[in-house]
């Protein structure tokens, strides 16, 4: 697909006007593999509020004709919740040294257009510009390779992440509960963290 999208960067309190759009997008995209999330826009908006409260956070938004078609988030790990900080602390990495990349969500019709690279480029540049982080990091959902719900044509992001310099960190795993389609609340492993020197 040819896309006439634009990329916008919003920092700290500039994020606030976009919370509802990004919350709705997250609910829509996270219904699919691998999240299978039975989402709630109000919960998502509250979750994203941590980004609006962080003076050094960033939203990278992909837009087409004024509509948000993709979003990628980041904030200093020290500004995130204990659940996100704990694996780093346990792994002897000071949260003050980490700029944490939240999720990237993109409508399926716009995948393969280079937007994922733009999301990483802008978040990495934002973290570097802040000048105080040794690491950029994120996590992703781990599902069993033989999970019968995995789409036959699913292609993971591991190769993309490795090409960008991110590595799994064995032993650094967090557990996050969320409501899964048809299952209710389920405790999920959010995989070994991926880290890269900033």
What does each model-found stretch correspond to?
Residues 6-22:
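A short beta-loop-alpha structural element at the N-terminal edge
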Residues 21-25, 46-47, 118, 122, ...:
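Alpha-helical elements of Rossmann-like donor-binding domains used by nucleotide-donor carbohydrate transfer enzymes
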Residues 24-39:
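Helix-loop element at the rim of GNAT/NAT acetyltransferase active sites that forms part
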Residues 35-64, 73:
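Active-site rim helix/loop that mediates acceptor-substrate recognition in acyltransferases
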Residues 71-104, 148-149, 172-187:
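Conserved acyl-donor/pantetheine-binding loop and adjacent beta-alpha core of acyl/acetyltransferases
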Residues 98-101, 120, 127-153:
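Conserved GNAT acetyl-CoA-binding A-motif
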Residues 106, 112-128:
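Conserved acetyl-CoA-binding loop-helix of GNAT-fold acetyltransferases
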Residues 153-159, 164-198:
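C-terminal "cap" of GNAT-fold acetyltransferases
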